[in-house]
Amino acid sequence: MSMIRNITICCLLLLLNVAAQAQETTDSVTTDSVSTQTTKQKLMARLNQVQQLLDTKARAKVDSNYIEVPKKPWRVVLRYKESVYDVDYSNSVGSPAAGDGMDWEMRFEPPLSASLGVWAGYRGLGLSVAKSLGRKKGTSLSFSCTGAKYGANLRLRGFDIDEATLTGTIYEGGQVLHGTSDAHFRAPVSIASIYLNGYYVFNGRRYSQAAAYNQAVIQRRSAGSLLLGATWYMAALDYSDDMNTGMILLSRNIGRINVQQGNIGVGYGYNWVPFRGFVVNAMAMPAICFYNRMKVYKYDSNYEIAESEGQVDDYGQWNPDTHTWANGKTHKPIPIDDDDTSWYGTVDSWEVGSETTFSMLRFNVNLRIGIAYNWSNYFIGLQSQFNNFNFKKDQCKVNLYDAWARLSFGVRL
């Protein structure tokens, strides 16, 4: 409840700030100067009351010998970030255990993604917007709320990629063949994620998780604390475009994957302060996944993978209304190793349904390292974080690795 109350107060603070500035502009053009001045004074008085409340709450619950609350509450930060986001999706086609089929793994491993963004906030509340640099475009939004005893972060991210690594093991006629190749998607694959994290600090009077990550406060002496944390993670992988039909056929006709996970864990964080203004933080939190759901969307098309190469009969034209070829058949075979790609021009695919499965309890991990140095009204920081989320059901496995490193420079106002 304290977190919700602080968020509400911050929103009110920002709205009052905007209203006060708008009212000040109106003062220069209005003819009713007395009434306007009175309204402005009331707004500014209310704004000061809210600011004083937040400032008082920021100082009331900490030991000033260990944690310093800066006098200037506003912070504006310029951030440069390098991100890594890997998705490993593996499955089986046929019956590999019986010696006839294929195990395969598709790995989306985009190169390091660089982004530049701005973070702005008041005390422990802030909002950031970042835009990807270079060829791989994407946008990231995040909201953070931290206090002496708690913290919460919400991160939204989305980007497109058209490359993956495909590793396969083929079982046929008693032979086992291994192979790895680069897969180039003819249409971009869309990847989006939502990450919500919250934690409780048992030793909040002397230890601040925020000191090394958003510089809401300054850690004056070394201290550590047990942490109780929870995360909610959602990821969506979409390669259902008609031009990606070949990969959909290899994926058991799956064209979209949605994963949702809820995790809870207990960890430990420590702030080391070798000299004034400088802090090094390390945090590790193993977590148990108590909710693990994967929903896949199945697609059908007018093509199917042929079991062997050979002459393909004349199928004529495809009728999208009846979902049949001119010869009455519904699927035209294509050899899996056929180099002829002209058939892509006649692909027609459509969604036919979805399947939802739940995985057993899984173990994930959340690791963080942060360094910050504060001087005068300025600060500089270097932070990194690693998250792992995984799903397993029968022959289907999904592993997601989400990591980033960030360099930031900010000023207190």
Model-derived features: positions:
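Short loop/turn motifs that connect adjacent beta-strands in outer-membrane beta-barrel proteins
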Residues: 57-73, 203-224, 274-280
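Outer-membrane beta-barrel translocator domains and adjoining extracellular loop/strand segments
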Residues: 88-95, 140-142, 165-170, 210-213, ...
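Extracellular loop and loop/strand-boundary signature of outer-membrane beta-barrel proteins
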Residues: 101-104, 138, 179-187, 213-214, ...
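Outer membrane beta-barrel transmembrane domains
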Residues: 89-95, 102-105, 117, 126, ...
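Short sequence motifs at beta-strands and strand-loop junctions characteristic
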Residues: 107-110, 119, 133-135, 188-190, ...
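Outer-membrane beta-barrel translocator/channel fold
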Residues: 81-98, 155-194
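Outer-envelope beta-barrel architecture signal
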Residues: 39, 70-76, 114, 123-125, ...
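Residues on the lipid-exposed face of transmembrane beta-strands in outer-membrane beta-barrel proteins
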Residues: 78, 116-122, 141-147, 196-202, ...
